[in-house]
């Protein structure tokens, strides 16, 4: 059984036991449980497709930790102008493990 969920403007295909890195969920403490209610599709013995979401479906996940990703360097340069910018960016994310899919 798997489901397609929407979180943070992105879609994820998940099944029980999967580990995901979602955009930072404020107030999510490690070892706590969260519910993801925007379920777009559930595929098991039969398929349920939402319009836009499946009624009564949810995905239960347990928070592993909150962390920051690797630094990405953004470098802009204009040739022959002695003009350059250097910026760094680190993505904040919440790592979760999928515990249950309720359809």
Curated annotation (Swiss-Prot):
<dbReference type="GO" id="GO:0005840">
    <property type="term" value="C:ribosome"/>
</dbReference>
<comment type="similarity">
    <text>Belongs to the bacterial ribosomal protein bL21 family.</text>
</comment>
<dbReference type="InterPro" id="IPR018258">
    <property type="entry name" value="Ribosomal_bL21_CS"/>
</dbReference>
<keyword id="KW-0699">rRNA-binding</keyword>
<dbReference type="InterPro" id="IPR028909">
    <property type="entry name" value="bL21-like"/>
</dbReference>
<dbReference type="Pfam" id="PF00829">
    <property type="entry name" value="Ribosomal_L21p"/>
</dbReference>
<keyword id="KW-0687">Ribonucleoprotein</keyword>
<protein>
    <recommendedName>
        <fullName>Large ribosomal subunit protein bL21</fullName>
    </recommendedName>
</protein>
<keyword id="KW-0689">Ribosomal protein</keyword>
<comment type="function">
    <text>This protein binds to 23S rRNA in the presence of protein L20.</text>
</comment>
<dbReference type="GO" id="GO:0003735">
    <property type="term" value="F:structural constituent of ribosome"/>
</dbReference>
<dbReference type="GO" id="GO:0006412">
    <property type="term" value="P:translation"/>
</dbReference>
<dbReference type="GO" id="GO:1990904">
    <property type="term" value="C:ribonucleoprotein complex"/>
</dbReference>
<dbReference type="GO" id="GO:0005737">
    <property type="term" value="C:cytoplasm"/>
</dbReference>
<comment type="subunit">
    <text>Part of the 50S ribosomal subunit. Contacts protein L20.</text>
</comment>
<dbReference type="GO" id="GO:0019843">
    <property type="term" value="F:rRNA binding"/>
</dbReference>
<dbReference type="InterPro" id="IPR036164">
    <property type="entry name" value="bL21-like_sf"/>
</dbReference>
<keyword id="KW-0694">RNA-binding</keyword>
<dbReference type="InterPro" id="IPR001787">
    <property type="entry name" value="Ribosomal_bL21"/>
</dbReference>
């Amino acid at each position: 059984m798997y489901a397609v969920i929407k979180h943070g403007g992105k879609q994820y295909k998940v099944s029980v036991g999967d580990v995901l890195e979602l955009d930072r969920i404020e107030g999510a403490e490690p070892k706590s449980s969260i519910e993801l209610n925007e379920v777009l599709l559930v595929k098991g013995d039969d398929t349920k497709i939402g319009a836009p979401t499946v009624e009564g479906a949810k995905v239960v996940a347990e928070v592993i930790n909150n962390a920051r990703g690797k630094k990405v360097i953004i470098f802009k340069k204009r040739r022959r102008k002695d003009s350059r910018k250097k910026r760094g960016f680190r993505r904040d994310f919440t790592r979760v493990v999928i515990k249950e899919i309720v359809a």
